[in-house]
Amino acid sequence: KAFDFILRRYAMGMYAKYVPGDLHIRHLEALLHELADAGVTVYPFISPIHVTHLELMAEMNLINDYANWKRKLVQVFSEVNQDLPAQQQIVLWDFSGYSEITTEKVPDLQQQQFMRWYEDSSHFNQDVGGIMLDRMLGRQSVDSVTEIPFGVVLTSDNIDVQIEADQRNSRRYRLDNPEEISRLQKMLDSLE
């Protein structure tokens, strides 16, 4: 499939060597405080990686770490926002869930087809970027193509509900796409 090269790189590199830690989270918190103190408006988001990455993380037993990373992000944003007036609150958007965009079918490499939403499994195209900007800025997207809302604001009030929704959607995706899950498993087996 078209994404195999990138997925293998992640499986052998970043995901295989992943060690949970808070160093980057602490750096983010310091940066958010600096930006807020300087009066800079930021629009942070979790990238809409293709679900093959989420399922690869699940196959590598990293999906709970990913969920915990999201929880830590929400905690950081909540703590930073405590020190900010209402008009300066920083909103964290999550576009990484299961949507019509992130579940786009991956073409076979031999078909040489272009995908509507992705350049590769971790790089969305400018059309997706435009939809994301519209969502974050509160504009009606010109290309409202998704029946399921794309992107959600993460807060301490909804993070666990969103993670549970991702888990449900993963189970549904796995049931509906067994060949994709089997392909990921075979790819991981070939790396051992």
Residue ranges and their predicted role:
Residues 84-117:
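Flexible internal linker/loop segments at domain or repeat junctions
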